[in-house]
C-alpha cells in the first residue's frame, strides 16, 4: 500500500527508467534530418566509421564506447530500415532497443514490433566484431526473422546466418557461426555448445564467444524451458522386461488402498498394503533391499506413468512412440524424453516399443548456458509476473515499454460454472453468437484432450472451425495468421502459434476485433496473459474472457473451496454462473501459489546444477587447453607420473628400500610391469637408493626412449589427443556417478540431513576422485603406448585422425535428451582394457572397480590384503 502511494508521487522504478530513455530518444531524433540527407553510400560509410571507432577501443572499454555511439548507431539503423525495409522505428521501439542494449528484458505487447526492435541492439553490439546471437523458440521464427531483417543487416555491412535443426553439415554450421549475426533456437545454441566441448580440434568448435544474446519470447525459454536440461546421452544396459513387469504391478494397485496421490506436488506415496502387494507380485521379500533398488524405482515410475501422466494432455502416441506435449505451448516436443525411466514407463503403459534408458555424456541447463553470456537481454509480451525470478536467477531486470497506441482490448471478468459440461455449453453458445455475427474468435484450451472435446461439440453444432494443437503443429503459422478472418473460429492449445501476428481488416475492427475465449485458467498467469495478448495489437479493438468450472484442474486442486462456498450460498441453478472481481482475484491467488511452486522447483534444479556447472566449467576449460597446440602436455604427463608414483609409495611401509620386505619389493616389481609396462629386475630394486628416484627415472627414460621416433609436433598431438580421450571417458563416468548420486540424494532428508548440502559435499569428493583417476589412468595409458618405428607413429597419427573424426561425427541429434547409437567408449588399439569405474572389479572381490583395484592396485604382492 505504502509502496503504491510512493509510486504515485515519485513514479515507479519503471517510470524513472522510461524517463531516462526518453531523453536519449530526443538525441536520436535530432540526428534524423542529418542522416536523411545522406546517400546510401554516405550512410554506410558513417556506420563503418562507428565500427572502426568501437573496434579500435580496448576490449574492456568497448561497452562504454557503445553507449557513446548509441545515438548515431540507432539513428543510422532507423534510417537504413526506412530505406530497405520501408519501416521506421517508433520512439517506443527506440526505447526497447536501449533496454536490450542495457542487458534487460523489454516487455512489449503483441504487435509492437519486437523483431524490428532487436535490430537496434543487434546492429549496435555487432560493432564490437563478435557474433551476436538472436535466440527464438522455434525454427520457423528463426528463419522468418533472419530472412526479414537480413537486407537491413547487409546494408549495414553485416553478414547473417541461421542455425536450424535442418543444418546437419558441420562445415556449414561452422560457416554460419562465423557470421556477424546468428539467428537460431535455444536448443540449437545449447546443443552446439555441448557438442563443441566434445570436439577434438579448436578449429572445429563453432561457438567462438558468448558476447551478447537477445532471447525472443524470453519467458518461454528462460522460465518455461528451465526445468528441462539439455542432455546428450548414450545407452545404458537395463533389462527391458522390468518396465513391463512394473507396469503390470502398477495397474493392479488401487488408489487410496495401495497408494495415495499428491496432485499438488505430482507425487505418489505407496502405503504399507501397497508395498506388501508389490513384494508379492515381484516375488521378493523386501522391495527396499539394495538389490531390489531397480525394481522399486521402476515401480515408482510406473505408478507416476499410470496415475499422474495422461494421454492427449501430457503426451500423445504417434508412430509407435510416446511423444511429449509441452505443457506451456501445447506443441509436440519431438525427440525429447522424460528422464529417470519415466519415459520407458509410459512406453510400457501404452504398449509401444520400449527404448533404452540412457547415460548422460554431456548436459547443461538453459539457466547456466545463457548465464555464460557477457551480456544477455530478452523480449516478450509477458514478463512482469516473473520479474522476481528473472532478477534472482539471471540478474535481468524487466522494463515495461509503453505501447505505441493505447490498448483498446476489453478484458472481461471470469465466468465460473459449477461443472465442465455447463462451461462448455456456455462456450459453444458464445462462439455461435460471435460466428453468426462474423466476428473472429480464438479459443484457448489447456490440453489436446480439451481441444478435441471442443472440436466435437462445434462439429455437432455444425460451426466451421480450425483446430491448432500439437497434432497440427506443422500448419501452426498458417492457421494463426487466418485466425483474424471474418467468421473464423480457431481452437488453439495454450499458446501454440506464438510469435505470429494476427492482422485484422477494417471490417473486422468494426465488428469488435478478435474475441478471445479462454476455456480454462493455466497454472501461470503469464500464459493466460499471452492468450489475451493475441487480441488488441497496435491499438486494435478486441475482447477477452475466461470461462471456468469448479472441475478445472487449477480450481479443483488449489482454489475451489472458497469459490464453491460462494456458489452454494448463491444457490445457482444448472447453467448459471458467477462473475465478480472477488472470484477473479481468488483464481489469480491460486495461480500465484502454483507459480511459486514452479519457481521453487526451477530454483532447486539450478542449485543442484550450479554444483555440476562449476565442475563442467573446470573440465571444459582444461579441454580447451589440451586442444591448444601450445599447451605443455609434457609437463602435465610428468606431473601425473610424479602423482602416480607418490600414490604407490605412500602405501609402502617406508621410503627406504632397506625397510621393504622381499614380498613388497616383488609386489612393486609386478605393479610397475602390469600398470606401467616397466620391466625392472628385483635385484635392481633391492640395490636402488632412494627407491623412489630410481623408479621415477626408470619410467621417465622408458617413456622418452619410445617417443624418440616422433618429432615434437607429432608427439604433442598424440599426447594431447590421448589425454583428451582419457578425460572424456572419465568425465562421462563421472556424470553417470553424479546422476546416481542425485537420484537418491533426497532420501538423506529422512536422516535429518539437508540433501543439497550432502550433494555438494559428496559431489566435491567425487570430483576430487575424478581428477585423481585421470592422473593415474593417464600415466598408465602413456606407459603402455608402443612405437617401435616410424611406421608405428604414422599408423598412430592416422588412427587418431580417424578416432577424432568418429568422435565428432557420432550419431548426435539436437534434442532435449539425446541418444547416441553407438558405444562411445572408443579405446586406442594399443591400450590394455581397463574396467569402467562402476563395473564389477575383475579381481572378483564383489566390489565396484573404483572402490577396489582402481584405488589399491591388483590384489598381489605389494598391495595384498
Curated annotation (Swiss-Prot):
Subcellular location: Cell inner membrane; Cytoplasm
Recorded catalytic activity of this chain's protein: ATP + H2O + cellular proteinSide 1 = ADP + phosphate + cellular proteinSide 2
Gene3D superfamilies: Helical scaffold and wing domains of SecA, P-loop containing nucleotide triphosphate hydrolases, SecA, preprotein cross-linking domain
Molecular-function GO term, any one: metal ion binding
Topology within the bilayer: Peripheral membrane protein
Cofactor: Zn(2+)
Principal cellular location given in the protein's record: membrane
Binding site for ATP: 93, 111-115, 501
A GO BP annotation: intracellular protein transmembrane transport
Binding site for Zn(2+): 841, 843, 852-853
PROSITE patterns: SECA, SECA_MOTOR_DEAD
Full protein name: Protein translocase subunit SecA
Native species: Helicobacter pylori (strain P12)
Phylogenetic classification of the source organism: Bacteria, Pseudomonadati, Campylobacterota, Epsilonproteobacteria, Campylobacterales
Annotated gene: secA
Amino acid at each position: 500500500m505504502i509502496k503504491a502511494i510512493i509510486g504515485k508521487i515519485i513514479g515507479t522504478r519503471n517510470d524513472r527508467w522510461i524517463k531516462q530513455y526518453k531523453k536519449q530518444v530526443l538525441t536520436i531524433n535530432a540526428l534524423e534530418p542529418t542522416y536523411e540527407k545522406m546517400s546510401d553510400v554516405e550512410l554506410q560509410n558513417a556506420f563503418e566509421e562507428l565500427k572502426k571507432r568501437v573496434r579500435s577501443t580496448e576490449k574492456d572499454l568497448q561497452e562504454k564506447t557503445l553507449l557513446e555511439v548509441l545515438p548515431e548507431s540507432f539513428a543510422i539503423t532507423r534510417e537504413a530500415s526506412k530505406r530497405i525495409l520501408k519501416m521506421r522505428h517508433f520512439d517506443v521501439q527506440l526505447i526497447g532497443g536501449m533496454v536490450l542494449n542495457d542487458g534487460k528484458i523489454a516487455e512489449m505487447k503483441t504487435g509492437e514490433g519486437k523483431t524490428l526492435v532487436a535490430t537496434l541492439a543487434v546492429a549496435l553490439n555487432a560493432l564490437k566484431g563478435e557474433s551476436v546471437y538472436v535466440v527464438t523458440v522455434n525454427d520457423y521464427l528463426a528463419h522468418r526473422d533472419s530472412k526479414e531483417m537480413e537486407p537491413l543487416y547487409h546494408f549495414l555491412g553485416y553478414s547473417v546466418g541461421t542455425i536450424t535443426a535442418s543444418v546437419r553439415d558441420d562445415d556449414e554450421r561452422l560457416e554460419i557461426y562465423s557470421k556477424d549475426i546468428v539467428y537460431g533456437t535455444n536448443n540449437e545454441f545449447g546443443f552446439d555448445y555441448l557438442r563443441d566441448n566434445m570436439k577434438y580440434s579448436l578449429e572445429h568448435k563453432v561457438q567462438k564467444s558468448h558476447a551478447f544474446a537477445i532471447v525472443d519470447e524470453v519467458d518461454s525459454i528462460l522460465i518455461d524451458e528451465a526445468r528441462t536440461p539439455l542432455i546428450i546421452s548414450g545407452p545404458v544396459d537395463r533389462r527391458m522386461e522390468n518396465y513391463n513387469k512394473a507396469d503390470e504391478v502398477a495397474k493392479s494397485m488401487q488408489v487410496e488402498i495401495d497408494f495415495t496421490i499428491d496432485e499438488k506436488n505430482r507425487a505418489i506415496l505407496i502405503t504399507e498394503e501397497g508395498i506388501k502387494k508389490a513384494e508379492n507380485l515381484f516375488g521378493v521379500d523386501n522391495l527396499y533391499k539394495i538389490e531390489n533398488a531397480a525394481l522399486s524405482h521402476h515401480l515408482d515410475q510406473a505408478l507416476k506413468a499410470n496415475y499422474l501422466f495422461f494421454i492427449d494432455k501430457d503426451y500423445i502416441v504417434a508412430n509407435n512412440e510416446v511423444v511429449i506435449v509441452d505443457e506451456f505451448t501445447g506443441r509436440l516436443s519431438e525427440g525429447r524424453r522424460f528422464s529417470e525411466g519415466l519415459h520407458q514407463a509410459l512406453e510400457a503403459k501404452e504398449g509401444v516399443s520400449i527404448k533404452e534408458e540412457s547415460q548422460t555424456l554431456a548436459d547443461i541447463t538453459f539457466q547456466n548456458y545463457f548465464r555464460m553470456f557477457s551480456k544477455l537481454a530478452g523480449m516478450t509480451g509477458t514478463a512482469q509476473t516473473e520479474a522476481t525470478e528473472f532478477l534472482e536467477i539471471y540478474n535481468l531486470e524487466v522494463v515495461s515499454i509503453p505501447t505505441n497506441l493505447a490498448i483498446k482490448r476489453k478484458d472481461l471478468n471470469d465466468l465460473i460454472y459449477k461443472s465442465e459440461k455447463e462451461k462448455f455449453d456456455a462456450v459453444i453458445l458464445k462462439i455461435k453468437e460471435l460466428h453468426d455475427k462474423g466476428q473472429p474468435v480464438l479459443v484457448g484450451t489447456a490440453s489436446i484432450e480439451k481441444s478435441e472435446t471442443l472440436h466435437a461439440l462445434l462439429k455437432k453444432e455444425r460451426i466451421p472451425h480450425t483446430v491448432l494443437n500439437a497434432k497440427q503443429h506443422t500448419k501452426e503459422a498458417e492457421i494463426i495468421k487466418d485466425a483474424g478472418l471474418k467468421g473464423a473460429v480457431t481452437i488453439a492449445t495454450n499458446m501454440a502459434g506464438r510469435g505470429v501476428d494476427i492482422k485484422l481488416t477494417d471490417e473486422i475492427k468494426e465488428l469488435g476485433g478478435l474475441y478471445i475465449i479462454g476455456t480454462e485458467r493455466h497454472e501461470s498467469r503469464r500464459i493466460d496473459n499471452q492468450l489475451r495478448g493475441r487480441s488488441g495489437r497496435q491499438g486494435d479493438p478486441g475482447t477477452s474472457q475466461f470461462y471456468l468450472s469448479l472441475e478445472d484442474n487449477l480450481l479443483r486442486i488449489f482454489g475451489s473451496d472458497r469459490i464453491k462456498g460462494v456458489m452454494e450460498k448463491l444457490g445457482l441453478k444448472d447453467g448459471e454462473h458467477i462473475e465478480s472481481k472477488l472470484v477473479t482475484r481468488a483464481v489469480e491467488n491460486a495461480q500465484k501459489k502454483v507459480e511459486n511452486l514452479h519457481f521453487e522447483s526451477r530454483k532447486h534444479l539450478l542449485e543442484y546444477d550450479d554444483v555440476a556447472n562449476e565442475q563442467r566449467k573446470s573440465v571444459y576449460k582444461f579441454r580447451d587447453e589440451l586442444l591448444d597446440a601450445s599447451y605443455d602436455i609434457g609437463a602435465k604427463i610428468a606431473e601425473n607420473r610424479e602423482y602416480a608414483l607418490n600414490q604407490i609409495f605412500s602405501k609402502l611401509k617406508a621410503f627406504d628400500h632397506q625397510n621393504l620386505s622381499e614380498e613388497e619389493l616383488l609386489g612393486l616389481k609386478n605393479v610397475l610391469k602390469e600398470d606401467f609396462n616397466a620391466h625392472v629386475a628385483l635385484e635392481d630394486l633391492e640395490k636402488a637408493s632412494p627407491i623412489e628416484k630410481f623408479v621415477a627415472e626408470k619410467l621417465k627414460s622408458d617413456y622418452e626412449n619410445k617417443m624418440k621416433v616422433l618429432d615434437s609436433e607429432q608427439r604433442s598431438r598424440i599426447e594431447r589427443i590421448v589425454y583428451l580421450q582419457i578425460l572424456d571417458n572419465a568425465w562421462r563416468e563421472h556424470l553417470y556417478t553424479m546422476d546416481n548420486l542425485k537420484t537418491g540424494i533426497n532420501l538423506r532428508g529422512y536422516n535429518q540431513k539437508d540433501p543439497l548440502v550432502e550433494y555438494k559435499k559428496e559431489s566435491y569428493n567425487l570430483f576430487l576422485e575424478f581428477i585423481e583417476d585421470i592422473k593415474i589412468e593417464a600415466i598408465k595409458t602413456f606407459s603402455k603406448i608402443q612405437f617401435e618405428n616410424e611406421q608405428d607413429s604414422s599408423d598412430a597419427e592416422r588412427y587418431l585422425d580417424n578416432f577424432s573424426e568418429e568422435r565428432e561425427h557420432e550419431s548426435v541429434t539436437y534434442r532435449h535428451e539425446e541418444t547416441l547409437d553407438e558405444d562411445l567408449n572408443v579405446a586406442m588399439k594399443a591400450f590394455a582394457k581397463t574396467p569402467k569405474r562402476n563395473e564389477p572389479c575383475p579381481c572378483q572381490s564383489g566390489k565396484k572397480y573404483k572402490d577396489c583395484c582402481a584405488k589399491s592396485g591388483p590384489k598381489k604382492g605389494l598391495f595384498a590384503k
